């Protein structure tokens, strides 16, 4: 997709704050500091539309990015961040669950994992949660440029096995540095919008 127009419409915490729209939405889920903001910025060809932080746990709201009057990316708080209070994590959990289980415009979730590492228990639980609610998932295995090409398939296999990956879902090797996987990710997103 050729992206020229992107706008952060709202940062929401409750359903009544969600934008009133019929446009399809894709939520972006992933561990804190896994590269969600870098993924968004790569996909929309912007350097800093989604704030990239060295500090995990920066995103604390549902951030609705309208793309080309065609769809929304919804950046959700990263999970698995230990330095946030248990109460705060529980609030985020309720906020994310409410959005994912009740939003009619949601076409799928883009779950971002780090190709360099075996998915965490939090990654596995998120994927299992999405499958329980029968939500289509595009797994983006990011940071592919950080490991030798010869390890890509081995690491991808570990990710798939750890998540108990559903073959009906999509899987993309991705790099924000080289833009590898960008076109493939857009293709899967477009297919889900039809």
Curated annotation (Swiss-Prot):
* One protein family per Pfam: MMR_HSR1
Assigned protein family: Belongs to the TRAFAC class TrmE-Era-EngA-EngB-Septin-like GTPase superfamily. EngB GTPase family.
Q: Which cofactor does it need?
A: Mg(2+)
Q: What positions does the entry give for Mg(2+) binding?
A: 37, 59
Q: Its GO CC terms?
A: cytosol
Which species?
Answer: Listeria monocytogenes serovar 1/2a (strain ATCC BAA-679 / EGD-e)
Which intervals hold domain EngB-type G? 22-194
Q: Which residues bind GTP?
A: 30-37, 57-61, 75-78, 142-145, 174-176
Q: Does the keyword Phosphoprotein apply?
A: no
Q: Which InterPro entries match?
A: G_ENGB_dom, GTP-bd, GTP-bd_ribosome_bio_YsxC, P-loop_NTPase
Instruction: Tell me the keywords, alphabetical order.
Output: Cell cycle, Cell division, GTP-binding, Magnesium, Metal-binding, Nucleotide-binding, Septation
Q: What does this protein do?
A: Necessary for normal cell division and for the maintenance of normal septation.
SUPFAM superfamilies listed in its UniProt record: P-loop containing nucleoside triphosphate hydrolases (SSF52540)
Q: Which NCBIfam families match?
A: GTPase_YsxC
Please, which domain of life does this record's source organism belong to?
Answer: Bacteria
Name the UniProt record assigns to this protein: Probable GTP-binding protein EngB
Task: Tell me which Gene Ontology terms the entry assigns under biological process.
Answer: division septum assembly
Q: Does the keyword Nucleotide-binding apply?
A: yes
GO molecular function, a single term: GTP binding
């Amino acid at each position: 997709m050729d992206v020229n127009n992107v706008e952060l419409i709202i940062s929401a915490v409750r359903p009544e704050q969600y934008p009133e729209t019929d446009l399809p939405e894709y939520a972006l889920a992933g561990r804190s500091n896994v590269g969600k903001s870098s993924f968004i910025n790569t996909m929309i060809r912007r350097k800093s539309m989604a704030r990239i932080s060295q500090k995990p746990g920066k995103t604390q709201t549902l951030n609705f990015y309208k793309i080309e009057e065609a769809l929304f990316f919804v950046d959700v708080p990263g999970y698995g961040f230990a330095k946030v209070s248990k109460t705060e994590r529980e609030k985020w959990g309720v906020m994310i669950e409410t959005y994912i289980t009740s939003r009619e415009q949601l076409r799928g979730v883009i779950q971002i994992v780090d190709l360099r590492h075996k998915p965490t228990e939090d990654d596995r639980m998120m994927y299992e949660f999405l499958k329980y609610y029968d939500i289509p998932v595009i797994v983006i295995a990011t940071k592919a440029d950080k490991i030798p090409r010869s390890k890509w398939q081995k690491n991808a296999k570990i990710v798939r096995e750890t998540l108990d990956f559903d073959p009906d879902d999509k899987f993309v090797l991705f790099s924000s540095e080289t833009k590898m996987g960008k076109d493939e990710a857009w293709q899967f997103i477009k297919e889900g919008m039809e």
